[in-house]
Amino acid sequence: MSHTEPKAPVNTGEVENGHLYDGSGTEDDPFIVEFQKDDPGNPMNWGQSRKWFIAAIATLSVFAVTFTSSAYSVSANEVFKDFDISTEVFIVGLSLFVLGFAIGPAVWANIGLRSELYGRQILWIITHIAMVAFLGGSAGSQNVATLLILRFFAGTFGGSPLVNSGGTIADLFPPAQRGLALTIYCVAPFLGPILGPIVGGFVSESVGWRWVQGVCVIFIGVVGILGIVFIPETYGPVLLQRRTHQLAKADGKIYVSVLEKNQGKKLPSEVFKRALFRPWIFLFLEPIVLIASVYMAIIYGTVYMFMGAMPIVYNEDRGWSVGIGGLAFLGIAVGIIFGLVYAIWDNNVRYMKLFAAKSANPESRLPPAIVGGVALPIGMFAFAWTNYPSIHWSVSIILSAPFGFGCVLVILPIMNYLIDTYTIYAASVLAAAAIFRSVVGAVFPLFTTQMYHNLGIHWASSIPAFLTLLCMPFPLIMYRYGEAVRMKCKYSFEAAEMMRKMQLQQTAAATTTEKDKDSSSE
């Protein structure tokens, strides 16, 4: 049986009278609330300009946080003067910030601040305010302990955009459009750490390390305000849940969301437990997530390894100043930009043709990763063995570009692949990948200085190159056998079945609506 929403004086902002829901409105047969065709309450049906503006702010937040994590890394000489500490202690400030990216989501899950229960908007507000507060405090630190602790807490809250922003983009764009949006979004966690030292180096050299933190406070604060003003709630299950409450309040009948019907009603304690443990379940019990996360973590760790490696290669060995030394990251930055251009071209030319022909599957995302998997070790080995002081500095910087190029072409397709594979579990999968890569990103800088001094700049730079060489077959293997693997993994299979059911229900609802329109016209 179908039901037309009552014309109650409820200003919901999303609910529109005339939508048809299956059910009878009773305890045994509640109305099933779901997004209808062209439903204005569905974020995927919002205007393109609005969606892209929201996506741009979410992406800028990720860039700001990762920029902040690395801008600190070139302030060593200034911090040494104020606190009389060793290089190892200084590097801890970088590692603790990145470690916060991993710990943050688990902490919020434990205290109940999870997007799956309350939505993404509240997380944005709380975490950006907290980041500004802790970074502002770190700028005024009077001892190194305060500096390290406050940077850790800033990073803990900074982990929110890394996970939450990706979920926001998945909320806004269907698979046909999501590739381009995620292409731009996924560049931010890698371009931010690369550009941070360039800006931070000149700021530190000119006005001191405290203003490096100050610039980051201003940056994150402005982005946070933009998000508070312009980004509404986008998480579909929360929007549907709110709609069920509004409809029930309007006419007193029983409504449940389609996701609640399919998965069952969850108590807050169950949601918290799931949010705390599910990323780890995905990470260790889903082979696709584990292998993909390891690959991305190696790349991410290498990016942060460069925070300690570049000053050794160019500042110590070549005598460059702090500001000029930051420019050594330009080669990787240019490679990232070229990778972004290639990824956009591939999405528009190759993937969209497959999608239009209805022959695209998650594995269709992976061909660029095969190219990127080859570019990564080439760039890293080239950088490692051309950074002799006797070879002109421009050679090693130019040859580091393939590493940046490969970063984009490996990370972007894998992220899209995980989202397309796990759909309704995408937030938890992205959280698992983010947690793991953040832990690795925090660990790599801790041994970078000793590794470069003990092994030398050539062999030390070659170690992560060998690791990426080991991972190189993964995209090719998954491209060839991924579909069979997905069907054997519990959660990827469950996600596929859930999406199939939801699509069938939406098709049936659309058919019913068309029949009702035809009947009324007669």
UniProtKB/Swiss-Prot annotation:
Gene Ontology cellular component annotations, sorted alphabetically: plasma membrane
PROSITE patterns to which the protein is assigned, alphabetical: MFS (PS50850)
GO molecular function: transmembrane transporter activity
Compartment list: Membrane
Positions of region (Disordered): 1-21
Membrane topology: Multi-pass membrane protein
Cysteine pairings via disulfide bonds: none
SUPFAM superfamilies: MFS general substrate transporter
Main location as per UniProt: membrane
Entry-linked InterPro entries: MFS, MFS_dom, MFS_trans_sf
Keywords tagged on the record: Membrane, Transmembrane, Transmembrane helix, Transport
Deleted gene: phenotype: The production of sorbicillinoids shifts mostly towards tetrahydrobisvertinolon.
PANTHER family associated with the record: MAJOR FACILITATOR SUPERFAMILY (PTHR23502), MULTIDRUG TRANSPORTER, PUTATIVE (AFU_ORTHOLOGUE AFUA_3G01890)-RELATED (PTHR23502:SF158)
Functional summary from the UniProt entry: Major facilitator-type transporter; part of the gene cluster that mediates the biosynthesis of sorbicillinoids, a diverse group of yellow secondary metabolites that restrict growth of competing pathogenic fungi but not of bacteria.
Protein name: Major facilitator-type transporter sorT
Organism this protein belongs to: Penicillium rubens (strain ATCC 28089 / DSM 1075 / NRRL 1951 / Wisconsin 54-1255) (Penicillium chrysogenum)
Taxonomic path: Eukaryota, Fungi, Dikarya, Ascomycota, Pezizomycotina
